[in-house]
Design a protein with these regions (language model features):
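An N-terminally biased module of ancient metal coordination in phosphate/nucleic-acid-related enzymes
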Residues: 1-77
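Active-site gating loops and adjacent loop-to-helix segments of metal-dependent hydrolytic enzymes
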Residues: 73-99
């Protein structure tokens, strides 16, 4: 791969959180923009990842499983976001984050 470049966006949101596009349309846009690798990092959910995996495969885009976790810094009183990538146990993550989604 020497001398080659890969265009990527590793912080995308779909309608599963605060994005404006459904996953298929989001990935079609990524393809039109020349992106070869994306991570859909919806807030506090991996629910769209199976659909994303299928659409990415159909479009020839490399998908990194990701999400954006909403958190609170008690020292500063600020809401913060933590990006996570390469998640393998989606069910466990979904179960852990379910109460936080309900509190929004």
């Amino acid at each position: 791969m020497e001398g080659q470049s890969l265009r990527a966006d590793l912080h995308l949101h779909s309608r599963w959180s605060d994005g404006s596009l459904p996953i298929p349309a989001l990935l079609e846009l990524a393809k039109r923009l020349g992106l070869g690798c994306v991570a859909i990092t919806d807030h506090d959910t991996l629910a769209g990842q199976p659909q994303a995996a299928a659409a990415a495969q159909d479009l020839g885009i490399h998908l990194i499983v990701g999400l954006e976790i909403s958190a609170f810094d008690p020292d500063t009183g600020r809401k913060v976001h933590i990006l996570g990538y390469g998640i393998r146990d989606a069910r466990r993550v979904e179960d852990t984050l379910a109460p936080y989604r309900q509190d929004r």
